Amino acid sequence: MELTTDIADFTRRDIELNGKTKPVLVTGSTGPAVIVMHEIYGFTPTVARFCRWVRDAGFRVYAPILFGEPTAENAEKLTIARQVSLCISREFTILFANKSSPVTDWLRALARLAHQECGGPGVGAIGMCVTGGFALSMAIEPVVLAPVLAQPGVPALSSAALDIAPDDLKHVVARTRQGLKLRGYRFEGDELCKAQRFSTLHQTFGEAFSGTELPDSAGNPAGFKAKGKPPHSVFTGDLIDAQGQPTRAAVDEVIAFFRGALR
């Protein structure tokens, strides 16, 4: 699928929930809802492409804009200003472990709204990078039936820890005992989402968590590798959009996970 900054096939909605209004880009008119949370760069052409793949599989996609502009013109470039703003923001818990980011309260409300609008058994949710763990915190909401953690890179100061409050974590564990399944994705050499975090997820959730670790050789040469770093962004900048590529197969796997849980 071609990468483009043109998002005429998305509709911007300014949605007020819990007293806070955020722009949400919506695409698709039928099917169960899936919430796609962008990376630290904001909403980019590669995030829009992923949303379209999910939409074309028969889902209605809600992409909340948590930072950056509500367009696909955000560059896949991390700025010091963005890092500082996230670290001092009251909505995000970036550095420290065992805390749920306050913004996840709003995201759970969005999940409830999306479920009301779309119907079906429930809602899917995928977070990426700095938002990766948000899908885990969202899973305390009963309508969230298919949480996916893509290269969860937070908390930044502890490679094995999770960015979720202990009581929230207990709630998610209880849901897995009732049948909830979770999926996670990372590259083997990822320095931002290390293997220790997936080990914690396996230890915490057992067979309810399915973690896929892709070889670094599967990363796009034009992505993080071009900067001399191991690949990181499984479904966006480090994805190779070609048949037989492990990253493209991972997209199909996630879509199958959504179908299995939401239909």
Locate predicted features:
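C-terminal catalytic histidine-bearing segment of alpha/beta-hydrolase fold enzymes
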Residues: 208-263
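Serine-hydrolase catalytic machinery in alpha/beta-hydrolase-like enzymes
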Residues: 6-122
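Short, hinge-like loop/turn segments at secondary-structure boundaries
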Residues: 78-83, 165-167, 230
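The conserved SAM/SAH-binding core of class I Rossmann-like methyltransferase domains
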Residues: 62-64, 150, 185
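Primarily recognizes the serine-hydrolase "nucleophile elbow" in alpha/beta-hydrolase
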Residues: 108-164
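Gly/Ala-rich phosphate-binding loop of Rossmann-like dinucleotide-binding domains
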Residues: 55, 139, 202
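N-terminal targeting or regulatory segments adjacent to alpha/beta-hydrolase or S9 domains
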Residues: 1-7, 27, 56, 236, ...
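The feature captures the conserved acid-bearing segment of alpha/beta-hydrolase catalytic domains
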Residues: 155-217
